[in-house]
Design a protein with these regions (language model features):
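Amphipathic, charged-and-aliphatic alpha-helical interface segments
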Residues: 39-52
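C-terminal structural segments of small proteins and small subunits
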Residues: 69-96
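Alpha-helix C-capping/helix-to-loop hinge sites
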Residues: 27-30, 47-48, 79
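Residues within well-ordered alpha-helical secondary structure of globular protein domains
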Residues: 22, 44, 78-81
Length: 98
C-alpha cells in the first residue's frame, strides 16, 4: 500500500494519531462481524461518501481478508440501493485496480 494518509497527523500530533489508531483497531477487530465484513461495510460507506481512494484501499483490504470481487460488488449494490448512483460512480473510478 502507499503512504498512510495520516502520517502527517502522526508527525504533528502523535497523541491524536494514537487515538485514531485505537479507534480503527476497535472498529476492525474480529467480533460478531468478521474483519472481511467490516471492510466491506466501510468500503460501501466510503462509496456513499464519494471517497474513491477509500473505496480502493478498503476493497483491497477486504480482498486481503478473504473477500471476492463478487462480495465487493454485492456490498456496492447495498450502497447503491441506500444512496443512489453516486456511490457506483465513485466505485467505478477505482475498481479496475483491485
Amino acid at each position: 500500500m502507499s503512504k498512510n494518509p495520516l502520517d502527517i497527523i502522526r508527525d504533528l500530533d502523535e497523541e491524536l494519531f494514537k487515538g485514531v489508531q485505537l479507534s480503527r483497531d476497535l472498529a476492525f477487530k474480529e467480533g460478531a462481524l468478521s474483519v472481511k465484513e467490516k471492510y466491506l461495510i466501510a468500503m460501501a460507506l466510503d462509496a456513499a461518501h464519494g471517497a474513491s481512494d477509500g473505496v480502493l484501499s478498503l476493497a483491497k483490504q477486504a480482498q486481503a481478508a478473504g473477500a471476492s470481487k463478487k462480495e465487493i460488488m454485492e456490498a456496492l449494490r447495498v450502497a447503491f440501493y441506500v444512496t443512489g448512483a453516486g456511490s457506483i460512480y465513485t466505485a467505478a473510478k477505482v475498481l479496475e485496480n483491485i
